[in-house]
Amino acid sequence: MIALIAALCGAAVGGASWYRARAEGPAALLKHLPRSGALILYVDFAALRRAGILGAIQAPAATEDPEYRDFVRRTDFNYGRDLDTALAAFTPAGRFLLLRGRFDWGSLRSYAQSEKGECRNTLCRMQGSTADRQISFFPLQSNLMALAISQDDSAAVRLQESVEGSMPEIPDAPVWFSIPPELLRSGGLPEGVQPFARSLENAESVVLSLAPEGKQVAARMNVRCRTNKDAAELTSELSKATALLRTVIEQEHRAPNPADLSGVLASGAFLSADARVMGYWRIEQAFFDNLLSEARR
């Protein structure tokens, strides 16, 4: 997750001051992102820094992507230090982000132009890693970047306007995802979570959040079902899938490993209330260490 945001920000370079407005929270900013069928991700980097978590899960500079290191050197922008929040919508049409932090717009503009991009007024455009990855961005505020990676080389401009449609529920957590039912039905999730994803295919909404809890991180799931009966059945299915996973681990004569996904999933607990299903998992530091180790290979 951290690597994903870093990669997107490393691909992004910004413009100049456009207009100034009061700081907005995730609910207000979310109105500007496409939400229909979108995977929504929110990360409060400032909160993670204050909690001492970001440094623990951030890759050392020596292991970061060389292109990202070059971007940091030439723009003096480092997400671990300068990015406060990131709100992103991942859709079939592209990736759309609102990034709040401290930006040296002059350096970002120069970087874009040096990479064969162009900047007109406050909007900058540049080619991404492939022909269909056109990057566009501009400052909605001095500390708020609108960024799009899409086939449309001006897609970031759309983020000025509000988008009609339903809003996901926003949990009180520094990291959260709103997962569209379309993604759950697509089979595009990691193999280890497929049994759980299949159980969630008929849910009306699924929100996952991550927040510090002592020396661990708590992952919580909030699912809205169509009926109370659906919620009770989903709770039963998820509990059975978790019990089956624990049985398989035991049959292999091993204990759940907190450093891998199966160990995290095996810690799951579920309950329902009316048409809601709540899930809970414990995530230890070893899991994040393992993720970083895999990312460095």
Question: Where are the regions a protein language model picked out?
Answer:
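One face of beta-strands
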Residues: 39-41, 97-101, 204-208, 215-223, ...
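Envelope-exposed proteins and targeting segments
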Residues: 35-39, 93-95, 141-143, 217-219, ...
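A cross-kingdom marker for long, charged
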Residues: 252-297
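Long, low-complexity, Ser/Thr/Gly/Pro-rich intrinsically disordered segments that act as flexible linkers
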Residues: 17-118, 212-214
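Short amphipathic alpha-helices in soluble, non-transmembrane regions
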Residues: 109-117, 234-239, 294-295
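Short hydrophobic-aromatic micro-motifs
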Residues: 39-43, 97-98, 136-139, 143-149, ...
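An internal, short helix-loop-strand segment that often contains or flanks glycine-aspartate motifs
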Residues: 51-53, 59-80, 118-220, 224, ...
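Hydrophobic membrane-insertion alpha-helices, especially the h-region
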Residues: 1-15
